Amino acid sequence: MQGHSFFSNAKGKTPAGWQKAFYYRYWMNNEIYHKTVAHFGIRTKDFKLIFYYGNPLGKTGSSKYATAYTPEWELFDLRKDSLEMKNEYNNPQYAKVIHELKKQLLKLKSRNGDNEDEKMPEMQEIMKKYYW
């Protein structure tokens, strides 16, 4: 995770130049405790976009019994759905938002040094087939 103090924000004072988006990645695919599919995503004030690529990629912590899942996307409009109950990814009204978030997601992914999967043929195939 990117490390910056959140103290000013907690007091209701957002510092100038504060980042507008947060990138995260969950490597472990179907590991024993959480049973969560491997994914990465972006969170802004208004939206959360998640790409469940669902492949263990041989990562430590992934279940040795994990199988690959069909990749899928989720988009939540946090202004209307703070509990993240309605996936808006296939809603055409959000097409432009999705496109912009995907571009921003790749920039943040790279900026944070998360580029290991660029050397993984499996992940390259997933990105080619399911990202855009």
Question: Where would I find each of the regions flagged by the language model?
Answer:
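Short clusters of small/polar residues that mark proteolytic maturation junctions
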Residues: 53-54, 87-89
